[in-house]
Amino acid sequence: KKNSNKLVLGDGNINSPIMLIGEAPAAEEEKTGLTFMGETGDLLKKMLHAIDIKKQNIYSTYTVNFRPPEDRKPTSTEIKRYSQFLQKHITIIKPKIIILMGSTAMESLTGLNSKISAERGKWKEVIVENSTYNIIITFNPSYLLRAPENKKHSWEDLKKIKQKIIDLNLDI
């Protein structure tokens, strides 16, 4: 946790059927203690709005709950260190849908260490403490700010999320 001042645990509706898991907080998130702030948060809000979801109506957290030095990607060691905490977090929230945003979230919950482009947009199931959860992997909004050409793929993923919400008759 060198260079990190504050843990960013999660925020939003703890009773939501949707849990969104990102990579790790950046400077603004660390400062405010809230998830997905600044430009990344603005893009996430627009993405969710496109499928009729308000960010405050879902629960969001991070794979690694501290800001890595120089905002670098969390290491596999850091991901493993926080994975038990993340799994406990999931069992407390008990979401019907988990949206994994980015490769760090994907690696933590699925063990996959492949490219997001190969795994995104597919519904999978993951077992956490004897309960099965529906997950979908998509790009992290911070990545989309750097690689906007992938927004079209995220839109496809968002439409699948919207359809799953309808199929499961979830109230968001």
Residue ranges and their predicted role:
Residues 1-172:
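A polyanion-binding, active-site-adjacent surface
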